[in-house]
């Protein structure tokens, strides 16, 4: 949900499916993760192709739902990544790439939402940030694709322009107004002014 506003990309670029569907985000749907067919069905509904990357997330590395999803994605030619807390698992073997941060035993045995889940979230942040950098959605280390949809984000956009170009706050605000709050366009406009190419 944070990738489109942070990097200015379509919400279709990064999508998520979860065993049990959207309802599972607020209420446990017991047994939903036990179906390989459901994992495949949910990815089929997303129309996965060879142009996609599918990341299967499971701390144990044995979740049938994830196995089904990765199997379907692999058959469609997608790049498959297993993100698990254990090495040498069925999910790891089902994927082309395995990422298995070694977090050690949980504080509460079996409660993988703690260390394993936290490590997986960090890995997902690394994957998404790296992808957006590679796609040019970042200038130096500034998130120039950010959608300036509220006051806080607009102020951030102004700061980015000031830091990246040496423009004053007034110049940055004016540049944003002139281009309809499109931060990358304002950045190019101010860079040309600073380099003497004109506006």
Regions found by a protein language model. Give the residues of each.
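Glycine-rich phosphate-binding loops that contact phosphosugars or nucleotide phosphates
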Residues: 1-122, 131-133
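Short, amphipathic alpha-helical interaction segments embedded in low-complexity terminal/linker regions
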Residues: 126, 131-199
């Amino acid at each position: 949900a944070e990738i489109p506003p942070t990097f200015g990309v379509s919400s279709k670029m990064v999508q998520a499916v979860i065993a049990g569907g959207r309802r599972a985000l607020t209420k446990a749907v017991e047994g939903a993760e036990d179906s390989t067919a459901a994992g495949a069905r949910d990815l089929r509904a997303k129309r996965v192709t060879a142009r996609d990357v599918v990341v299967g997330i499971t701390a144990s590395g044995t979740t049938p739902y994830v196995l089904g999803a990765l199997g379907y994605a692999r058959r469609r030619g997608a790049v498959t990544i297993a993100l698990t807390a254990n090495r040498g698992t069925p999910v790891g073997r089902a994927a082309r790439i395995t990422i298995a941060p070694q977090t050690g035993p949980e504080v509460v045995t079996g409660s993988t939402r703690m260390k394993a889940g936290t490590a997986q979230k960090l890995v997902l942040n690394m994957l998404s940030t790296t992808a957006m950098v590679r796609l040019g959605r970042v200038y130096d280390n500034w998130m120039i694709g950010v959608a300036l949809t509220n006051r806080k984000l607009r102020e951030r956009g102004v700061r980015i322009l000031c830091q990246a170009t040496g423009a004053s706050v007034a110049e940055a605000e004016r540049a944003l107004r002139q281009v309809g709050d499109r931060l990358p366009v304002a950045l190019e406009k101010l860079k040309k002014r600073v380099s003497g190419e004109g506006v």
